[in-house]
């Protein structure tokens, strides 16, 4: 950005209240500082691909652009905090955020649970990744999050292992949390194929947190997703008919809607310059010279 005259020092000299956020892949120091970074690369370096390991794959991706999105959320948090600070200080600031640091911080609390406590005499947790196991039936999968003794009693009865109730491995939260890989093993092979609907009925009755595993093809027809208004469909000039999530933050007394697609490059160039008081002749000269991009819809 310095090369094109848009560096932090240059712009903040013009406007001391400017909040300038610089996002990098690996940070501004170290042997990888100047290397290109994309989501896949950060997933690998930050431990996400190890987190997703299985018996079949020692390393695997989380199959969504999670590192891009985590970094974006981190930038939003930083910008919001800096804006609030500026109310008091009347000053802007320069903020550096690396994808690697943001994603390592995101993954660490549960993904590195077993590496957080360094003293041998402290309570040693199982890796958080060991806590995830789907119960698979012929007609689909069930996601469960058993925590309490009563949850596990209901769950062990449901998957057909009542003889394990009260055994040392399952008897206490402490035992379960330190042996999570062994504890969750029974969910891989339920002794009866009772099906998803019956499993959900049993778990809900026992107050065990659970849900059926949705196919992505079924999300638009989900009654719960419809109930909270999480998706909307509208028509745009450029892209035609779209179905997208509505903004998930619900402010009191306000309807939430995406309302329209993101603008195309140059779609609002003319109107922005008009708003800034630029003469139409000057705008036309910039368009004709190729210096200003205009997209007419």
Which functions belong to the PLM regions below?
Residues 2-147, 154:
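Active-site-adjacent "lid/gating" segments in soluble enzymes
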Residues 205-257:
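A glycine-rich dinucleotide-binding beta-alpha-beta segment and adjacent secondary-structure elements
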Residues 130-206, 210:
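Aromatic-enriched alpha-helical interface/lid elements that frame and gate functional surfaces
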Residues 9-11, 36, 225-231, 296-297:
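Short low-complexity, flexible loop/linker segments enriched in glycine and/or proline
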């Amino acid at each position: 950005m310095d090369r094109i005259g848009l560096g932090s020092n240059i712009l903040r000299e013009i406007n001391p209240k400017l909040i300038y956020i610089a996002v990098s892949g690996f940070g501004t120091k170290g042997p990888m500082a100047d290397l290109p970074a994309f989501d896949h690369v950060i997933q690998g370096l930050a431990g996400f691909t190890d987190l997703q390991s299985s018996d079949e794959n020692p390393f695997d991706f989380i199959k969504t652009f999670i590192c891009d999105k985590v970094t974006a959320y981190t930038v939003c948090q930083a910008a919001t905090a800096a804006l609030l600070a500026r109310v008091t200080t009347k000053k802007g600031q320069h903020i550096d955020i690396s994808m690697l640091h943001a994603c390592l911080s995101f993954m660490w609390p549960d993904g590195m649970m077993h590496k957080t406590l360094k003293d041998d005499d402290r309570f040693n947790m199982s890796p958080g990744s060991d806590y995830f196991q789907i119960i698979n039936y012929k007609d689909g999968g069930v996601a469960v999050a058993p925590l309490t003794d009563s949850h596990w009693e209901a769950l062990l009865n449901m998957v057909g292992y009542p003889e394990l109730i009260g055994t040392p491995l399952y008897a206490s939260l402490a035992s379960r949390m330190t042996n999570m890989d062994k504890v969750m093993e029974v969910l891989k092979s339920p002794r009866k194929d009772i099906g998803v609907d019956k499993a959900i009925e049993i778990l809900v009755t026992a107050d065990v947190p659970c849900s059926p595993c949705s196919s992505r093809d079924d999300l638009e027809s989900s009654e719960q997703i419809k109930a909270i208004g999480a998706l909307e469909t509208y028509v745009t000039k450029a892209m035609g008919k779209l179905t997208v999530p509505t903004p998930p933050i619900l402010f009191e007394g306000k309807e939430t809607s995406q309302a329209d697609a993101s603008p195309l490059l140059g779609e609002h160039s003319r109107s922005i310059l008009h708003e800034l008081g630029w003469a139409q002749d000057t705008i036309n000269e910039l368009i004709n010279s190729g210096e200003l991009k205009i997209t007419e819809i």
